[in-house]
Amino acid sequence: MAATLTGSGIALGFSCSAKFSKRASSSSNRRCIKMSVSVEEKTKKFTLQKSEEAFNAAKNLMPGGVNSPVRAFKSVGGQPVVMDSAKGSRIRDIDGNEYIDYVGSWGPAIIGHADDEVLAALAETMKKGTSFGAPCLLENVLAEMVISAVPSIEMVRFVNSGTEACMGVLRLARAFTGKQKFIKFEGCYHGHANSFLVKAGSGVATLGLPDSPGVPKAATSDTLTAPYNDIAAVEKLFEANKGEIAAIILEPVVGNSGFITPKPEFIEGIRRITKDNGALLIFDEVMTGFRLAYGGAQEYFGITPDLTTLGKIIGGGLPVGAYGGRRDIMEMVAPAGPMYQAGTLSGNPLAMTAGIHTLKRLSQPGTYEYLDKITKELTNGILEAGKKTGHAMCGGYISGMFGFFFTEGPVYDFSDAKKSDTEKFGKFFRGMLEEGVYLAPSQFEAGFTSLAHTSEDIQFTIAAAEKVLSRL
């Protein structure tokens, strides 16, 4: 079966002769034009020959052939795919295969790839220069948008990645409280800084590593860990480390151990415990920020942390990160205060431009209702396909974020997630790839929908899932 929707889409009676289908080229165009399909398109064989050649060359140039481990397909097997272009809900590889994309550049592409308005705005900004190393007015605009949207943020500092945001916010929490220890949760990923690489999720979980060589013991000696959704374990840590804990940092919805939601009593309890013990609560919303709701997970759950990290969506697909929170805390950041942090490309005009135009689109009425609708349809459809074909599966969604596991469930923490049949997931992933659907190449990563995804995309994906599952 061809991975292009030109070939795979025959069952639905749709095809597209252009490089990208019309429904992929504009998020506002919700229709796919019915067209005739050539014999060549119908019989086109799925191949990754060019990807294989490119990847083999890359392995001599970059460690493992990639610049981020999960891209090497270590946990799913098969040939890593080398991508060429993307538009709307579609991504195309160098062999010409086109896929419905549920990775979305790992979250940023919430309005769809290569949005025309964002590209036009970037073109205008580039005429003025790509980076100044000095303040620009666009920083003010995006900062005002973030502050008005996110309940906890009264001041914000822009950086260049989610990792950098988490590094900065932890240093700030320690500076403000005068304490050194902090709590993170097993399977939660907060970037690759030394202090966080303890029982981490994301690519670390994908490779089956408890942590990373090269991290000094001293760097993690103040890192305390607890199982996610276990409030009793958190209380015990505070009891055993009285007056020493600066902060708790968590993904309010876990996306780096797969998709795991918090129990209501857990997230409420964390807020209470930090207040009672003079510790700060940090929400790592690099993934959930502007995705679960315009104000992020904190708006969705009605829990306001002291500090928040952001990334992905606020850069509209360009490298970006941010941390922000209460004014009295943020005023400790240099040059307003003594806590030093800096960056050559922080607040650069290109990332600010893409972020501004992405947030403008997300602020429109009906945005999150639409994301919720299509993601519900997708998640329920895949789980129903699993039920029909006799596979133990569980999963869930919130707005434009979803996930599923090959286990009976429920999944409340990383230890539950590890019960998933990862070998079966790998087979499912490879089968879906051949059917023209690109999922995250790891059982331990959440999936994402976008405003560019259509009902036809969702129905195609569900049909493909049932087809693949019936063969497993």
UniProtKB/Swiss-Prot annotation:
Enzyme Commission no: 5.4.3.8
MF term (GO), any: glutamate-1-semialdehyde 2,1-aminomutase activity
Major location (coarse): plastid
Disulfide bond is among the record's keywords: no
Cofactor: how bound: Can use both pyridoxamine 5'-phosphate (PMP) and pyridoxal 5'-phosphate (PLP) as cofactors.
Disruption phenotype: Suppresses partially the ENF1 disruption pleiotropic developmental phenotypes, including the suppression of the abnormal patterning of the adaxial-abaxial-related gene expression in leaf primordia.
Covalent S-S links between cysteines: none
Cited Gene3D superfamilies: Aspartate Aminotransferase, domain 1, Type I PLP-dependent aspartate aminotransferase-like (Major domain)
Family annotation (InterPro entries): 4pyrrol_synth_GluAld_NH2Trfase (IPR004639), Aminotrans_3 (IPR005814), Aminotrans_3_PPA_site (IPR049704), PyrdxlP-dep_Trfase (IPR015424), PyrdxlP-dep_Trfase_major (IPR015421), PyrdxlP-dep_Trfase_small (IPR015422)
Cofactor(s), by name: pyridoxal 5'-phosphate
Gene Ontology process terms (BP): chlorophyll biosynthetic process; protoporphyrinogen IX biosynthetic process
SUPFAM superfamilies to which the protein is assigned, alphabetical: PLP-dependent transferases
Protein purpose: Transaminase converting glutamate 1-semialdehyde (GSA) to 5-aminolevulinate (ALA). Involved in the biosynthesis of tetrapyrroles.
Assigned protein family: Belongs to the class-III pyridoxal-phosphate-dependent aminotransferase family. HemL subfamily.
Subunit organization: Homodimer.
The name this protein goes by in its record: Glutamate-1-semialdehyde 2,1-aminomutase 2, chloroplastic
Source species of the chain: Arabidopsis thaliana (Mouse-ear cress)
Gene this chain is encoded by: GSA2
